[in-house]
From Swiss-Prot:
The keyword Cytoplasm applies. This is A-kinase anchor protein 14. Binds to type II regulatory subunits (RII). Residues 1-11, 19-29 have a biased composition (Polar residues). InterPro entries: AKAP (IPR053084), AKAP_28 (IPR025663). Binds to type II regulatory subunits of protein kinase A and anchors/targets them. Present in cilia (at protein level). Expressed in tissues containing axoneme-based organelles (cilia and/or flagella): trachea and testis. Highly expressed in airway cilia. It comes from Homo sapiens (Human). The gene is AKAP14. Disulfide bonds: none annotated. It is found in: Cytoplasm.
Length: 197
């Protein structure tokens, strides 16, 4: 009887080993090694990209201000806060900007206060800039939120569709520079239209 049990046990062990060898990948297989290398390289690349992002954010942290609450909001305070935001975010002092209130939209659940920021840069060639770029700011004041809740602020550049939020996206001065450069190039292409006095 012990021989029968041993042979039955041996058969069961052989079947288990065979099943395990079928489910476990063969490490000698070249395809498996290639796939493993690709996965490892992708993982290493992701880790390096994440580390670079962390280092860049430490060198250039996102700059933001403490935005006012619903109870503190006025149109004038909105103008001041946008000025304060840009004084903190814009590093080059050659940019001149002006903020103006555009309109208030009454929605069912909130009010949207829209501001426009004009950007221009003076150069030695053109001490008075003829071209400006712009950024639209929207301050959303909810009718239902408590007075101590912060307002929602977003902005979008001239001729852009992507909406940005202060503190979540870094404001980049080169957006404005690229737009003003493109406008200057366009004006230089058609001098007969733009050189009128």
């Amino acid at each position: 009887m012990s021989e029968t049990q041993n042979s039955t046990s041996q058969k069961a062990m052989d079947e288990d080993n065979k099943a395990a060898s079928q489910t476990m990948p063969n490490t000698q297989d070249k395809n498996y090694e290639d796939e493993l290398t690709q996965v490892a390289l992708a993982l290493v690349e992701d880790v390096i990209n994440y580390a670079v992002k962390i280092v860049e954010e430490e060198r250039n942290p996102l700059k933001n201000i403490k935005w006012m609450t619903h109870g503190e909001f006025t149109v004038e305070k909105g103008l001041k806060q946008i000025d304060e935001y840009f004084s903190k975010c814009v590093s080059k002092k050659c940019w001149a900007h002006g903020v103006e209130f555009v309109e208030r939209k009454d929605l069912i659940h909130s009010f949207l206060y829209i501001y426009y920021v004009h950007w221009s840069i003076s150069t030695a060639d053109l001490p008075v800039a003829r071209i400006s770029a712009g950024t639209y700011f929207t301050m959303k004041v909810s009718k239902t939120k408590p007075p101590d809740a912060p307002i929602v602020v977003s902005y979008v550049g001239d001729h852009q569709a992507l909406v940005h939020r202060p503190g979540m996206v870094r404001f980049r001065e080169n957006w404005q520079k690229n737009l003003t450069d493109a406008k200057y190039s366009f004006m230089e292409s058609f001098p007969f239209l733009f050189n009128r006095v």
